[in-house]
């Protein structure tokens, strides 16, 4: 880590937030990947990296995402911003709101594509935060970001033509563990990249800003990820529990079978012996009906060298209803009959 909180212009790495808001809009069903997005005169006028969209042309949201993630298209960014929020200015307000919610305290966006503008700044740490949000919430971004070449079709008044997209992220072809994510470069920002990679179960993000050359930014990103992969190891446990029961009070049944919830994952960066991890299953003693399937009724506690490193929920395998008056009568009658037989 070096100068992680120094404010700098991010160039097209800005588009990570733009794509995050696009996926947010898709998830909320405000838009769909099949929607046709019109291109305004303003969007078509964007300089820098572009796919030469023309005024009045339409492209699907899916195609616009390809243009942004693969070719870093400034014109596609503005077209999407206008489609989602009505104007780039309104969209940028949403970008800053999303950034604040993610804890990106040293970030201020002025536009949606990263062209040099006064006050348009972020930090390496903040870029890592928005990158993590994008890849964890919308892992499908990797399909876009890892596409090396793709063709799109322009349909305009001039006719139909093909346009080739080539990925600006050379790590896609040069680094075996690469999974994305976004490059950027301008005269003011120099060369930037938010690189993501995965090896075994370890996923890393390496952010480089203000490198002097394109080659340098990629070399630095690879160096950081190789260092991270060498230091990090993952312990995961999703082994099913042996059959166990929890005692339920005031229920139509006195016992309920339990099971583990989600798998447990622990990331170690200190070279600890993961074989020394121990786990203890703790089922709550006071469980009152009603109990719903999936309710948390205990936890699996994981420790390493005597220190707790995390927990995983133990949940009810099925539900148990609260006992009513008739249920108590049946129980009392059953006990009475058993007593008479004895």
Question: Where are the predicted features?
Answer:
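Domain-terminus/edge residues, biased toward the C-terminal soluble/receptor-binding domains
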Residues: 104-105, 116-121, 125-342
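Active-site-adjacent loops and short helices of periplasmic peptidoglycan-processing enzymes
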Residues: 1-139
């Amino acid at each position: 880590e070096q100068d992680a909180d120094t404010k700098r212009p991010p160039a097209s790495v800005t588009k990570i937030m733009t794509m995050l808001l696009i996926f947010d809009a898709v998830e909320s069903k405000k838009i769909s990947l099949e929607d046709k997005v019109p291109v305004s005169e303003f969007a078509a006028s964007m300089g820098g990296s572009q796919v030469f969209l023309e005024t009045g042309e339409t492209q699907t949201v899916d195609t616009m995402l390809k243009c942004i993630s693969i070719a870093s298209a400034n014109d596609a960014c503005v077209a999407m911003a206008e489609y989602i929020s009505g104007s780039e200015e309104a969209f940028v307000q949403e970008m800053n709101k999303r950034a604040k919610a993610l804890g990106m305290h040293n970030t201020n966006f002025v536009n949606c594509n990263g062209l040099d503008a006064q006050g348009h700044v972020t930090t390496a740490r903040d870029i890592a935060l928005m990158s993590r949000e994008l890849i964890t919430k919308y892992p499908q971004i990797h399909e876009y970001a890892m596409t090396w070449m793709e063709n799109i079709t322009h349909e305009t008044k001039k006719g139909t033509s093909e346009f080739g997209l080539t990925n600006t992220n050379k790590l896609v072809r040069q680094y075996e563990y690469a999974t994305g994510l976004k490059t950027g470069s301008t005269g003011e920002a120099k060369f930037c990249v938010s690189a993501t990679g995965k090896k075994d179960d370890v996923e890393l993000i390496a952010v480089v800003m203000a490198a002097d050359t394109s080659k340098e930014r990629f070399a630095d990103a690879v160096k950081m990820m190789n260092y991270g992969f060498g230091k990090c190891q993952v312990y995961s446990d999703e082994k099913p529990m042996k059959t166990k029961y929890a005692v339920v009070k005031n229920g139509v049944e006195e016992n309920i079978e339990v099971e583990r919830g989600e798998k447990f994952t622990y990331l170690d960066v200190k070279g600890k012996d993961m074989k020394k991890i121990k786990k203890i299953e703790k089922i709550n003693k006071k469980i009152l009906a009603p109990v719903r399937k999936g309710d948390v009724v205990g936890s699996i506690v994981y420790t390493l060298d005597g220190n707790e490193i995390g927990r995983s929920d133990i949940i009810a395998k099925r539900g148990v209803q609260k006992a009513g008056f008739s249920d108590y009568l049946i129980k009392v009658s059953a006990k009475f009959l058993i007593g008479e037989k004895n």
